[in-house]
A protein has these predicted regions:
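HTH-adjacent hinge/linker in prokaryotic transcriptional regulators
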Residues: 1-28
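Glycine-rich phosphate/diphosphate-binding loops that line cofactor/substrate pockets in enzymes
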Residues: 28-40
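A short, charged, Gly/Pro-tolerant segment at domain boundaries
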Residues: 173-191
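Amphipathic alpha-helical interaction segments
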Residues: 32-35, 53, 57, 181
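Glycine-rich phosphate-binding loops that contact phosphosugars or nucleotide phosphates
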Residues: 39-158, 162-172
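Short secondary-structure junctions and interdomain/linker hinges
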Residues: 21, 25-28, 44, 170, ...
Length: 191
């Protein structure tokens, strides 16, 4: 394959991932998830492996709007954090499979503590989805050989961006003020 053909192939994979996710994503589930986040004392953006990086990216995007968004490191720290949650807290967990042992330990512990769970996943019948209060589907299909592909990651980040935009639009006065403050704070970092 030529480089031009590879570029076209990669482009098609990104479009397929985003389009599949847009078609699978429920507007009602987005609204419900954002409502939970707005009402929460804290929102913990969590994941394992490559999904933890995506959760961190989503958390960083929300950081310009509120200090209530947090991450919690590796699976051990996530489990410790989950044990200290209560009914005022929300977990936003990213997991393509929705079926990993570490994720289930963390989600069960958070649920037992009273926290609400929002799961970004591809599988609506996964163990994690069955435990979640809200499931946000990433519709992009991935084979085991493509594990952690960048188009799939982009599809999850697309869902994260939808959440951020809904969060901002539901409270524009606060969001505008927060963005002004954080933008001003970052100006000193520019050359």
């Amino acid at each position: 394959a030529t480089t031009a053909e590879l570029c076209e192939h990669a482009y098609a994979r990104f479009l397929t991932a985003i389009n599949g996710t847009q078609n699978a994503l429920s507007a009602e589930a987005v609204d419900e998830a954002v409502h939970l986040m707005q009402e929460a004392r804290q929102v913990f953006c969590l994941g394992q492996g490559g999904s933890m990086l995506l959760a961190n990216d989503i958390c960083a995007r929300f950081a310009s709007l509120s200090t209530k968004f947090r991450t919690a490191g590796d699976s051990h720290l996530q489990l410790l954090t989950a044990s200290l949650m209560n009914e005022a807290d929300v977990v936003l967990f990213v997991s393509y499979s929705g079926a990993t042992r570490d994720m289930m330990e963390t989600l069960r512990t958070a649920k037992a503590a009273g926290a609400k769970i929002i799961l970004l996943t591809h599988y609506e019948d996964s163990p994690g989805a069955l435990l979640a209060d809200v499931v946000l589907l990433c519709g992009a299909q991935e084979s085991p050989l493509d594990s952690g592909s960048i188009p799939i990651k982009a599809a999850f980040l697309y869902v994260g961006e939808v959440l951020v935009l809904r969060y901002m639009l539901d409270d524009p006065a606060h969001s505008n003020t927060a963005q002004d403050l954080t933008s001003e704070a970052l100006t000193v970092k520019m050359l």
